[in-house]
Curated annotation (Swiss-Prot):
Domain of life of the source: Eukaryota
Function comment: Binds heavy metals. Contains three zinc and three copper atoms per polypeptide chain and only a negligible amount of cadmium. Inhibits survival and neurite formation of cortical neurons in vitro.
Residue numbers of Phosphoserine PTMs: 33
Chain positions recorded as a divalent metal cation 4 binding sites: 34-35, 45, 49
Pfam name, any one: Metallothio
Organism lineage string: Eukaryota, Metazoa, Chordata, Craniata, Vertebrata
Gene name tied to this protein: MT3
Protein's name according to its UniProt entry: Metallothionein-3
Presence of the UniProt keyword Lipoprotein in the record: no
Binding site for a divalent metal cation 1: 6, 8, 22, 25
Record: residues binding a divalent metal cation 5: 35, 37-38, 51
UniProt GO MF annotations: antioxidant activity; cadmium ion binding; copper ion binding; metal ion binding; metal ion sequestering activity; protein kinase activator activity; zinc ion binding
Length: 68
């Protein structure tokens, strides 16, 4: 099954809930278990994390608001 596409691919608020299966979700309101820019072991990433950094940024340069 193909990954779902979020209605806000470039950021912004959307109805991305706990069951979000979007690939590369950039929804600032997404409450997925973890942001793609955070390490898998980051337990603080459970809710309201916001990925900061564009696609052009290096992977190391991407920061998550809950993972400082």
């Amino acid at each position: 099954m193909d990954p779902e596409t979020c209605p806000c691919p470039s950021g912004g608020s959307c109805t991305c809930a706990d069951s979000c299966k979007c690939e590369g979700c950039k929804c600032t309101s997404c409450k997925k278990s973890c942001c793609s820019c955070c390490p898998a072991e980051c337990e603080k990433c459970a809710k309201d994390c916001v990925c900061k950094g564009g696609e052009a940024a290096e992977a190391e340069a991407e920061k998550c608001s809950c993972c400082q």
